Amino acid sequence: MEPKIRRILNKELQRQRDCICLIASENYVSRDILEVTGSILTNKYAEGYPTRRFYEGCEVVDESESLAINTCKELFGAKWANVQPHSGSSANYAVYLALLKPGDAILGLDLNCGGHLTHGNKFNFSGKQYQPYSYTINPETEMLDYDEVLRVAREVKPKLIICGFSNYSRTVDFERFSAIAKEVGAYLLADIAHIAGLVAAGLHPNPLPYTDVVTSTTHKTLRGPRGGLIMSNNEAIIRKLDSGVFPGCQGGPLQHVIAAKYVCFKEALQPKYKQYIQNVKTNAASMASWFKQQGYRVISNGTDTHLFSLDVGKGKDVSQWLQQANIVLNMNTVPFDKNPAINPSGIRIGTPAMTTRGFKEKHFLYVAALIDKIIKSDGNKKVIKEVKKAVLKLLERFPLYKGLEY
C-alpha cells in the first residue's frame, strides 16, 4: 500500500480505538461490511438498474443489487426500494426531482428545531430550487406540535411535507402527518436517516403505511456502509422515483457499497439486532435521565430514540474540551437557539457506536459523569488530562477491530 495513505489509515484506526464515540450519526460496521466495501465490485460501472443496464458485463452486479433491493424490502416491509443513492442527501434530492417542479412549496422542520439541511434550508439545494416553509416544535414541551404543522400546511399548501429529523429525540406520529398531508393534497416524505435501525427492529413506528416515500441513510443506526436508500408503497410514483435517482441525479451506482448495503440489511434481520437496538435506546434514556438528575436541561426532557441533546450554554467549547479527553460528539443548536450554528448552545449525544463496541448501561453512566466533570471544570486542562486517562483505561476492555492493521 502507498506509505502515506497506509500511515493515515492506521492513524485513523488508532484514533477510533482510543476514542469514545458519541456522535449520533456514526457507528462501527462489521468486518464483513468493511471487506465488501473494499471489494473488487468497485471496478464495475453499471448505469441503470438490474437487467436494464447501459453497460455490458453487469450480470454479476445485477445479482448483488437485486439481493440488496429484496432484502431491504423484506427488512422494512416495502413494496419497492432503490438502493443506489450515494447518501441520504442524494436520496432526498432524487425524491424532489421525481415529485416536484422548481419553485414548488415544501414544508419541513426548522433546522434550529432539529430539521436537516435538505428539508428546506436556504443554503441547501432544497431551499434554493424550491420554496421552503418550516414548522417548529412546541417551545414548552420541545416536542412536535402537530397543530402547528396543520396550520402552516393549510396556509402554504405545500406540494411536499417532510417528516424526518437530524436532532429530534421523540417518537414521530406518522399517521398524524399523513392526515395533514392528505388534507392539503401534499406528498408525504419520511426521512428516517437517524431512526432507520429503530424502525427495522420494530422499536419505532414504521412510516411506510402512512407516507408516499421514505428515505434513509444506511450508516447510522442501521450500522451499514455510508450510503442512502429510497422506499415506497405508493406504486403510482415508483417509476418517477427510479428516474429521480437515475438519470435524474446520479450516473453509475457504487456497486461495492450496494453489496455492503445488502450485508447490512441481512445483519439487521438477525434476532440479535433487535436486542442491539433495544440496548441503544436503553443506554440513551439512562444517560439522558442521569444528566437531568444533575440539573442539565435535556431537550424535550428525555428521549425515545438513540440520541438526545443537552443545553450546555457553549456547545463548541464543550465539544472541543471533550475531544481533548478522547470523548467525541458534536456541538448542536438547541430549539430556538439564540447562538449561531457555528457556536451553538448545545451538544448532541448518541449511543449507537459505543453500544456496538460493547458498552452497557453502567459504562454510559460512567461516561456521563466524565462529561459532567469536564463541563463543571470549565475545560480545566488538568481535569481533561485525568478524564483522557480514564477513557483510555476504560477502552482497553473494549477492543475495536482486533487484529486489523493496514
UniProtKB/Swiss-Prot annotation:
Site (Plays an important role in substrate specificity): H219
Residues annotated with N6-(pyridoxal phosphate)lysine modification: K220
The protein's annotated pathway: One-carbon metabolism; tetrahydrofolate interconversion; Amino-acid biosynthesis; glycine biosynthesis; glycine from L-serine: step 1/1
UniProt GO BP: glycine biosynthetic process from serine; tetrahydrofolate interconversion
Keywords: Amino-acid biosynthesis, Cytoplasm, One-carbon metabolism, Pyridoxal phosphate, Transferase
SUPFAM superfamilies attached to this UniProt entry: PLP-dependent transferases
Cellular component GO terms, alphabetical: cytosol
Family of this protein: Belongs to the SHMT family.
Name the UniProt record assigns to this protein: Serine hydroxymethyltransferase
